[in-house]
Every structure is written in structure tokens, then in C-alpha cells.
């Protein structure tokens, strides 16, 4: 493929040319005059297209929700993971996205440079209540594996809700919790606004933050930023639970649950 050198760049088909974007570079190649596809190739391309469309829907829903540095290969990685989910369907001749198969997304990482278990030593638990809210409980943390320059560790939970029909998706996030980087922390619970009767992919995000003159800056080192799918909850996974307000208010006083916290653009290191 040749690089596009014109002022106006494009993606997709334009006449007898096809434009591509790989990373931040645009390429172009000529379109073939005739395409030969076997029956199996046509089916495989249809499955890939179905996975790509759902991947695009989920990425649009998540736009601006994750604070970790963006990865150029995240698009293809998510499409590949969704294609694996689609192929798990063994009930339909034309494979469909089945809610129970979305569990295959658990463990999918948006940050190939750092897995979640590298920056977080504990395993969180997730429960969906009757109203659809997601309660992500993070156990007590003894030591934080964060950036050496960090003064705080920021932990958030983001949920992508895939609606029936698999053509629409929404996303919601909890308020961030700031933990002192040099001190152990007590257990806390993140509450994500939820939607009933949807498939919810719960993502836990851990980033390193530096405080300067009362302002918080996210550090850019990718080795200490992680975002990973920790659970996938189906439409029937709601559980009856009771949240005691005295405990919740006591935890709010002890842990810095910062509503409307502004994390300024990442610092270069």
C-alpha cells in the first residue's frame, strides 16, 4: 500500500481506490476488478462484519469514558474478541450474539502494556442489584503498584451495556476513588449506574495520578495504567441486595470518593 500524500485524506472506497488508516498514517491501494469468494469465505466475512459492527457500537458508547492512553490496536483486538464470542453460538445456523457467550470477553484488556493484575493486587467482586446498578467492591489494598512519581492512584469502574438486538449500546461510569499511593487502603465499593435487561461488560480502570498545587494530573506511563473487563453480567444476573446507609456514609468519610473529579491532561514523562 502507498501512503496518501494529498491534503484531503480518506478512508473507504473512492472510485477504483480504497483508503486505509493504520495508526495515524493513511494508505491507499487499488480496488480489485473481480473478487472470487467461496461460500465459506462469504460466511466468514459476514461474521467478521457482524463483529466489527458491534465493536464499533461499543467503542462509540465508550468514547471519552476511559482515561487510559489509547492504543492503536484496540479496534482490531476488540473485533477479534467479539468474533470469538460470535463463534461460540452452536444453536443457530447463522451465528448470533448470545448473551451467555459474552462471558468470553472477561479478561479482555484495553491496555496491552499493562494487565490489571500488575497494577492491582486484589480481585474485585461485582453484583447487579434489582434496579440494574452495578456494585464493584474492591477489597483492602496493602500496597499500590503505581508509577513511582504518583501521589495518588485513581480507580474507576466503567460499564458498557449492550442492548437487545446488539445494534445499540450505552456506557456509564462510577465516580472515581483517589487513594494515597504510599498508604494501604480499606475496602470500598464503586457504584455504576446501570440498565436492566442488558448485557453489561464491567471494566475496571486503574491509573496513576500526580497532585501539583491542588490539581491532579494523570501520568502517561503506560506500564502503570490498566483497563480490563473484570466481569460480564447478563440480563438475568440481578441479585437482591441491601445497602446500609450508615456504612455507606461512613465509607464516604474515610475514602476520597470524589464526585465530579477533574483529571487534567496527561503529563509527559
Each model region followed by its residue ranges:
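Compositionally biased low-complexity segments at domain edges in trafficked proteins
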Residues: 235-269
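Long, polar/Ser/Thr-enriched low-complexity segments
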Residues: 1-114, 261-269
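Sequence-level detector for tyrosine residue identity
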Residues: 20, 27, 39, 47, ...
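Generic signature of intrinsically disordered, low-complexity segments enriched in small/polar residues
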Residues: 13, 23, 29-30, 191, ...
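Charged linear interaction tracts used for macromolecular binding and regulation
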Residues: 86-235, 241-245
